[in-house]
Amino acid sequence: MAPPAARLALLSAAALTLAARPAPGPRSGPECFTANGADYRGTQSWTALQGGKPCLFWNETFQHPYNTLKYPNGEGGLGEHNYCRNPDGDVSPWCYVAEHEDGVYWKYCEIPACQMPGNLGCYKDHGNPPPLTGTSKTSNKLTIQTCISFCRSQRFKFAGMESGYACFCGNNPDYWKHGEAASTECNSVCFGDHTQPCGGDGRIILFDTLVGACGGNYSAMAAVVYSPDFPDTYATGRVCYWTIRVPGASRIHFNFTLFDIRDSADMVELLDGYTHRVLVRLSGRSRPPLSFNVSLDFVILYFFSDRINQAQGFAVLYQATKEEPPQERPAVNQTLAEVITEQANLSVSAAHSSKVLYVITPSPSHPPQTAPGSHSWAPSVGANSHRVEGWTVYGLATLLILTVTAVVAKILLHVTFKSHRVPASGDLRDCRQPGASGDIWTIFYEPSTTISIFKKKLKGQSQQDDRNPLVSD
């Protein structure tokens, strides 16, 4: 039997989750948000995926109560198809089948995808020990939410219903080891609500006690928030807050998969979590849009019900989105000359200093991608490897010669400058005589050509100048 994590991953990315209880792995999404699958609009046309019976078309079952002739406008999801549906509010979707000797003309559909978030599944209970080992009670008015509320008040994480009237609570994370059963084996109706499944004989249906809570704090990327007391009708005089805060989210997408609020005074609001400004207000008079986005990472969901009227409530699926910062892509098919130009532009300040930027360019007989030292170049074998080694030695030798030449030139210039001794104060008169000062040699070095040495008189020789002779006017 597969562990629960794998099973829950097949249900949805929107499994009911709080920050303290992370959701299972994501999927495309659940196909049901109600306990009895009344909202199922999937395309399963067999009573079971393995060993099931084919369903009859709803537009060919005129001898039965539910058909397209009686419900021509698609009520209950009926139409010219043979998909499983729940038009009468039974405990799960079903369909008509060809009659057999036992007289059965309809069957429940076992649909793995039609399992509301928070429904953990149907499991075997052999009683020694039971799947949930906490407290328990029995009631002839048992519903899913009365059992969940009882277990939640006792601070248990899980609630289980069995045989329609028994409620079990516990924190046992290994409940799945007792063995999973088909969902149709937990279709015994709850004694308090005949439209809800409450387990079976030796079969327990499990729920997360977060379902139907009045308030909570959500931080998961995706989750489902139910109205208070769900799947029962919400009570009167309810005031509930849920915080949805996903750090780093650029927006949060909301989708009301179920919305049944009939009283015009009952309302659902979405508020800016930072300013408490009302973003969206929904009530019995204003139906929500199918879906919408809120460009925030912190939203407050607020629900209010007055003292009269009740309804099924709502189920809202939210999905947060985080936008990754744009990343700079490396240049594609960039030539070596472009790389050299880019590096030279980044080092443009070197042109105004005494430092020299050395650039080795390839021989014209070699294409740019085979230039020595290029990272995109791959070594070859045989004669090609010797050619590459030769180019590498050539480049290093050229660089060494240029460096030594520059150093020698700088030394010669330094010696020449030092040879002109600064005269004493008594000799200043002689130094001002025409022709008394020596000629200053200025050296310009260009790596791509040769070294040029020529005489150049500094401007304003009659005035003292302490500039570095290497700095040109």
UniProtKB/Swiss-Prot annotation:
Keywords: Cell membrane, Disulfide bond, Glycoprotein, Kringle, Membrane, Signal, Transmembrane, Transmembrane helix, Wnt signaling pathway. Changing residue 437 to L: Significant reduction of apoptotic activity. Gene3D superfamilies: Plasminogen Kringle 4, Spermadhesin, CUB domain. Disruption phenotype: Animals with a double knockout of KREM1 and KREM2 exhibit enhanced Wnt signaling accompanied by ectopic postaxial forelimb digits and expanded apical ectodermal ridges. They also exhibit increased bone volume and bone formation rates. Triple knockout mice KREM1/KREM2/DKK1 exhibit enhanced growth of ectopic digits. SMART domains: CUB, KR, WSC. It is a single-pass type I membrane protein. It is found in: Cell membrane. InterPro entries: CUB_dom, Kremen, Kremen_rcpt, Kringle, Kringle-like, Kringle_CS, Kringle_sf, Sperma_CUB_dom_sf. Disulfide bonds join 32-114, 55-95, 84-109, 122-186, 147-167, 151-169, 190-198, 214-240. Glycans are attached at residues 59, 217, 255, 293, 333, 345. GO terms for cellular component: membrane; neuronal cell body; plasma membrane. Residues 414-473 are cytoplasmic. Residues 214-321 form the CUB domain. Residues 1-19 form the signal peptide. In the adult, widely expressed with high levels in heart, lung, kidney, skeletal muscle and testis. Residues 21-392 are extracellular. Residues 116-210 form the WSC domain. Forms a ternary complex with DKK1 and LRP6. Interacts with LRP6 in a DKK1-dependent manner. Interacts with DKK1 and RSPO1 (via FU repeats). Receptor for Dickkopf proteins. Cooperates with DKK1/2 to inhibit Wnt/beta-catenin signaling by promoting the endocytosis of Wnt receptors LRP5 and LRP6. In the absence of DKK1, potentiates Wnt-beta-catenin signaling by maintaining LRP5 or LRP6 at the cell membrane. Can trigger apoptosis in a Wnt-independent manner and this apoptotic activity is inhibited upon binding of the ligand DKK1. Plays a role in limb development; attenuates Wnt signaling in the developing limb to allow normal limb patterning and can also negatively regulate bone formation. This is Kremen protein 1. It comes from Mus musculus (Mouse). The lineage of its organism: Eukaryota, Metazoa, Chordata, Craniata, Vertebrata.
